[in-house]
């Protein structure tokens, strides 16, 4: 009974674990094959300056057939000499024939080519045909051809991935002229609108001088203005101490009082914090403090605090 129970438990646990491990190994093997295949396909595209070769891009490549220097045969007979040289077209034709003969015959692959790739191939073939039909005497076409050849010599991945479609020269010139004139007129219109509508930090209009003088005279002659004794309109020297506490003195002086009026008003009622104490009594206040009153007697509070720290006598 015990052996049967162990076998059943082992089968119930071991069989699912074995199947799971087997499935994991199979998936790992297929993934490794897939990764290896992708790495082999992307070997050429990993380098930034390398050429890109896809399975459907063989028709887009332009065969570079450099002209080979063939020996020139000179036949000299008597007083006459004839030079038998081959033309450039014959050399190019011979090179293409040799390349075709040297390459082994390949079976065409049945690969799917999307519509945009077909259209791209047709546009490239049309562009190549137009370049061949151009006259070599045209300076503009010659300069363009030389630029294209230099570009092909040092092509990058970006140059190969972005196609260049054919365009009519007349249409390109007309569109460029129209765009230039349109941009010029639109820029001028925008500049004029901005000049009219833009606020260059404008300030409000200046008030008239008559209103300002009226306002100044009214403020000066007003009797409700309360100023300090050190005001510019006061003819008497200021006797107020800046270190004293604020007082409740009320100034009812005129704008420009005379010295006699100031002397007649010599007796004024000042309110200062030191008036709450008897300054002559030194036992109550050791030193005069203008900010001390009956609620904030700092000297007395300090004395009481020090006395509280001393040991008490029993």
Swiss-Prot record:
Membrane topology qualifier: Single-pass type III membrane protein
Record's keyword annotation contains Transcription: no
Region annotated Disordered, chain positions: 41-86, 125-151, 230-266
Membrane-crossing segments per the record: 9-29
Keyword Protein transport: no
Cellular localisation: Cell membrane; Bud membrane
Compositionally biased intervals (Low complexity): 136-146
Positions in the Cytoplasmic compartment: 30-314
Signal peptide range: none
UniProt main location, coarse: membrane
Extracellular side: 1-8
Keyword line: Cell membrane, Cell wall biogenesis/degradation, Membrane, Signal-anchor, Transmembrane, Transmembrane helix
Gene Ontology CC entries for this record: cellular bud membrane
Biased composition (Polar residues): 48-58, 240-249
Family from the record: Belongs to the SKG1 family.
Function, in words: Plays a role in cell wall integrity. Affects the cell wall polymer composition in the growing region of the cell.
Entry protein name: Suppressor of lethality of KEX2 GAS1 double null mutant protein 1
Encoding gene per record: SKG1
């Amino acid at each position: 009974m015990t052996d049967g129970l162990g076998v059943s438990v082992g089968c119930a646990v071991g069989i699912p674990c074995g199947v799971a491990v087997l499935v994991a190994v199979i998936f790992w093997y297929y993934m490794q094959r897939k990764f290896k295949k992708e790495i082999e396909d992307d070997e050429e595209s990993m380098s930034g300056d390398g050429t890109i070769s896809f399975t459907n891009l063989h028709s887009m490549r332009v065969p570079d057939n450099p002209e080979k220097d063939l020996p020139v045969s000179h036949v000299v007979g008597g007083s006459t000499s004839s030079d038998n040289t081959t033309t450039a077209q014959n050399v190019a034709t011979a090179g293409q024939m040799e390349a075709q003969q040297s390459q082994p015959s390949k079976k065409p692959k049945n690969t799917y080519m999307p519509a945009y790739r077909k259209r791209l191939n047709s546009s490239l073939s049309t562009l190549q045909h137009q370049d061949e039909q151009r006259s070599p005497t045209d300076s503009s076409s010659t300069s363009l051809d030389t630029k294209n050849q230099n570009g092909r010599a040092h092509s990058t991945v970006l140059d190969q991935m972005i196609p260049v479609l054919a365009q009519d020269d007349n249409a390109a010139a007309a569109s460029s002229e129209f765009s230039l004139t349109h941009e010029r007129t639109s820029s001028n219109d925008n500049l004029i609108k901005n000049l009219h509508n833009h606020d260059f930090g404008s300030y409000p209009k200046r008030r008239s001088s008559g209103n300002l003088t009226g306002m100044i005279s009214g403020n000066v002659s007003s009797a409700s203005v309360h100023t300090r004794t050190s005001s510019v309109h006061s003819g008497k020297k200021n006797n107020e101490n800046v270190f004293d506490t604020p007082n409740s003195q009320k100034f009812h002086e005129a704008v420009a009082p005379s010295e006699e009026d100031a002397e007649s008003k010599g007796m004024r009622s000042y309110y200062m914090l030191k008036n709450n104490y008897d300054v002559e009594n030194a036992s109550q206040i050791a030193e005069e403090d203008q900010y001390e009153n009956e609620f904030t007697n700092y000297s007395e509070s300090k004395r009481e605090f020090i006395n509280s720290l001393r040991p008490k006598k029993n």
